[in-house]
Amino acid sequence: MAKVQVLNVAVLDNPSPFGNPFQFEITFECMEDLPEDLEWKIIYVGSAESEEYDQTLDSVLVGPVPAGRHMFVFQADAPNCSLIPETDAVGVTVVLITCTYRGQEFIRIGYYVNNEYTDTELRENPPLKPNYGQLQRNILASNPRVTRFHINWEGCAEKMEDSENVDPAPNAMLPPSCTPGKAPLLGLVPDNSMDCL
């Protein structure tokens, strides 16, 4: 059984201008004292076509963590616009929150993000080069995709079964309009569970 349960993630400052920081209020519970840190990350998927455009916006270590319920606000700067392909700047993408313990990812929470112009003229006739100052980011907070992975919480050298800690299925969270190209996002994995918070 997992020693950490994520109870809630609240998306703050949503919708917001593209350049605003991402803010998530994360509530989790530890079933027992954890002697080592939890590592939380926020990852922005810059393009569904290649992982090379994924940006780790921030990473924070929390711990050691005593048993009980905990809450913190995780804030990360907006992605570096120069690292996003111009063709992927407007439209739907994904932001991921991951958590690892002893180097093993045990939960991945994904949200669809829609980047669009608020100005009607720009929406109907978008500029060839994205105008990030005019883009609004809207996170679909009501429908997160959650994937849980079985990990070895004790940190022993014994190996977990291969099917219990594998990457999610390819393209499981790509919007229907995207063509398959990589497997950056969430999906169902045997012996793991995926649900909504």
Curated annotation (Swiss-Prot):
Cellular compartments per GO CC? chromatin; nucleus
Q: Which residues form a coiled coil?
A: none
Q: Which GO terms describe its molecular function?
A: histone binding
The record's listing under InterPro entries reads: ASF1-like (IPR006818), ASF1-like_sf (IPR036747)
Gene3D superfamilies linked to this entry: Histone chaperone ASF1-like
Localization per Swiss-Prot or TrEMBL:
Nucleus
- Swiss-Prot/TrEMBL GO biological process terms: DNA replication-dependent chromatin assembly
List the keywords (alphabetical). Chaperone, Chromatin regulator, Nucleus, Transcription, Transcription regulation
Q: What does this protein do?
A: Histone chaperone that facilitates histone deposition and histone exchange and removal during nucleosome assembly and disassembly.
What does the record note on quaternary structure?
A: Interacts with histone H3 and histone H4.
The Swiss-Prot or TrEMBL record describes its family as follows: Belongs to the ASF1 family.
Question: What protein name is recorded for this chain?
Answer: Histone chaperone asf1b-A
Q: Which organism is it from?
A: Danio rerio (Zebrafish)
